[in-house]
From Swiss-Prot:
GO terms for cellular component: cytoplasm; nucleoid. It holds the Pfam family MraZ. Belongs to the MraZ family. InterPro entries: MraZ (IPR003444), MraZ_C (IPR035644), MraZ_dom (IPR020603), MraZ_N (IPR035642), MraZ_sf (IPR038619), SpoVT-AbrB_dom (IPR007159), SpoVT-AbrB_sf (IPR037914). Forms oligomers. One of its GO terms (molecular function) is transcription cis-regulatory region binding. The gene is mraZ. PANTHER family: TRANSCRIPTIONAL REGULATOR MRAZ. Transmembrane segments: none annotated. Keywords: Cytoplasm, DNA-binding, Repeat, Transcription, Transcription regulation. Residues 7-55, 84-127 form the SpoVT-AbrB domain. Its main location: cytoplasm. This is Transcriptional regulator MraZ. It comes from Parvibaculum lavamentivorans (strain DS-1 / DSM 13023 / NCIMB 13966).
Amino acid sequence: MNSFRGRYTNKIDSKGRVSVPAKFRAVSIAQGLNGIICFPPLSEGKFIEGCGPAFSEEIDRMLDRLDPFSEERDMLASVLLGESAELMFDADGRVNLPDNLRELAGLTDEVVFVGAGPRFQIWEPGAYAAFAVEAQKRVPGFRELLKSTQASLRPEGGGGR
């Protein structure tokens, strides 16, 4: 499996280290990095975005498609690259979360890792609980959006329902 899935709660120790879920470590290691890459989110919310090298390379490709002298590219690069951190796993599968990212997400003693396919999020548990309630309320309205992707998933000449 090459995607981040599931929800895991882990403690931050007194040195700012947190154990990355084994399944998340396996995804990043399979992509060639004995660590994870973390950066501030582009959407509203107090959490940290995380990924392996595959998604990080996709971010680089997206930025490369933008005008290299545009203000938007500069701002995106500042957040996605300048504020990012490559965090290597220690022998116990832990990473040291940088202070700037911990403060941004309001992380103190516990975090929730939430899989999101090619990337994942690291939340303060209370903030994630509130987000999850709101997501459960709103996601039924997104059904048509998800259904609109079905055409590209059906095999040629393929029937479907």
